[in-house]
């Protein structure tokens, strides 16, 4: 199941172009982000590398070309921001419920 979600997120990320890319980044961050964060740490380290290593690993995994590797880094930035906002929202709501109960 995890593998399916991860591959689906990559596929939508590669196919999105133009106007759909803005809309897809938030949705893709939820779909693909959950898969990449749960995935192995080695996978993230490989994506963070810049140069032929990152591109070769991307083509081996089935990504189309270098542009998908470039959008992946932008996508990860949006993903981190989204998770941070979600974490802050969850913390605030938890604190509000806790103090309301007292």
Swiss-Prot record:
Residues 1-79 are extracellular. Residues 56-71 have a biased composition (Polar residues). It is found in: Host membrane. One of its GO terms (cellular component) is membrane. Its main location: host cell. It is a single-pass membrane protein. Residues 98-102 are cytoplasmic. It comes from the Viruses. Keywords: Glycoprotein, Host membrane, Membrane, Transmembrane, Transmembrane helix. The chain crosses the membrane at residues 80-97. Glycans are attached at residue 65. Residues 1-21, 33-71 are annotated as: Disordered. Belongs to the HHV-5 UL15A protein family. This is Uncharacterized protein UL15A. It comes from Human cytomegalovirus (strain Merlin) (HHV-5). The lineage of its organism: Viruses, Duplodnaviria, Heunggongvirae, Peploviricota, Herviviricetes.
């Amino acid at each position: 199941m995890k593998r399916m979600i991860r591959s689906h997120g990559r596929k939508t990320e590669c196919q999105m172009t133009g106007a759909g890319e803005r809309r897809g980044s938030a949705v893709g961050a939820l779909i693909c982000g959950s898969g990449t964060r749960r995935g192995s740490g080695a996978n993230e380290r490989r994506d963070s590398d810049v140069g032929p290593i990152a591109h070769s690993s991307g083509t081996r995994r089935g990504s189309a070309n270098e542009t998908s590797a470039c959008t992946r880094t932008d996508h990860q930035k949006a993903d981190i921001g989204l998770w941070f906002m979600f974490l802050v929202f969850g913390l605030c709501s938890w604190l509000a419920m806790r103090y309301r109960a007292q």
